[in-house]
Design a protein with these regions (language model features):
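Class I S-adenosyl-L-methionine
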Residues: 170-244
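Conserved SAM/SAH-binding beta-strand->alpha-helix loop
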Residues: 71
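A short glycine-rich, Lys/Arg-flanked "PGG" loop and its adjoining helix->strand segment in the class I
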Residues: 138-153
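Conserved beta-strand signature within the Rossmann-like core of class I S-adenosyl-L-methionine
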Residues: 154-161
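Conserved beta-strand/loop positions that form the S-adenosyl-L-methionine
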Residues: 43-45, 68
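Conserved glycine-rich SAM-binding loop
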Residues: 48
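S-adenosyl-L-methionine
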Residues: 1-43, 51-60, 80-113
Length: 244
């Protein structure tokens, strides 16, 4: 269901201390936006209504967090949820930021100097594999290679989904993009780890009897990347043919 336009969203976000108003202007300097810039930096790609961010960020003041979504009408809900979570603990929201960004173009906003330690991807759009739309998946190698450029060596991606096809495909996506899958499960709640934070979507799918799939993948050396953009591969083949 399409979310309705919220005329109050932009003014309220502009008045929010932890909203990044012009995210394309901070490349290489994101850490400087936080009260404690030397802390590890974790991103949530597609933070939605903020259910996950509102749980994890206040509980870990020793880590800086950034929640990203593409529209203000979604981000305003995350802002309110995060704000309430910090208020409930009586602590300042000084280790969290939210920003409106197109995840497919993160390179426009970040540089390798921004040093991402961990990325969370929770219940992203699974995208149909028809007509090439799977390239928009947040775990597609095309996307993972983009994240690699921003991540520290040994940094991790924590991924959860309800979608069987997306998860099974992702089990091949990550290694192709040079990530080692260090942990995986096809039923997260069967032996639920203590560290798992259930999101709104997670609870909804679980109540419907849909198993939650999850994995943790660690960034490996550049020489472990095997995936090549199809267009680049075609150009390479054309060049080799011309050389012959």
């Amino acid at each position: 269901m399409r979310m309705r336009f919220k005329p109050y969203a932009r003014p309220e976000l502009l008045a929010c201390d932890f909203h990044v108003h012009e995210p394309l202007t901070h490349g290489g300097h994101w850490h400087e936006l936080y009260a404690r810039p030397d802390q590890p930096w974790h991103l949530e790609l597609g933070c939605g209504k903020g259910g996950f961010l509102a749980q994890i960020a206040p509980a870990h003041p020793d880590i800086n967090y950034l929640g990203i979504d593409i529209t203000d009408k979604v981000l305003i809900l995350a802002k309110r949820k995060v704000e309430a979570a910090y208020a409930a603990r009586g602590i300042p929201a000084d280790n969290v930021k939210i920003a409106s960004l197109d995840i497919e173009r993160l390179g426009n906003a970040f540089t390798p100097e921004d040093r991402v330690s961990r990325i969370y991807i929770n219940f992203c759009n699974p995208w149909s594999k028809n007509a090439g739309s799977n390239k928009h998946r947040l775990t597609h190698p095309r996307q993972l290679l983009q994240y690699r450029q921003l991540m520290d060596e040994g940094a991790e991606i924590w991924f959860k989904t309800d979608d069987d096809d997306l998860f099974r495909d992702s089990l091949s996506y990550f290694p192709a993009a040079g990530f080692e899958i260090t942990w995986q499960t096809f039923d997260l709640h069967k032996n639920e780890p203590d560290w798992n934070l259930r999101t709104e979507h997670e609870g909804m799918f679980s109540e419907q009897g849909i198993p939650i799939k999850a994995l943790i993948a660690r960034k490996g050396p550049d020489n472990t990347v095997t995936w090549v953009e199809p267009k680049a591969l075609a150009r390479q083949q054309e060049a080799e043919d011309d050389a012959d």
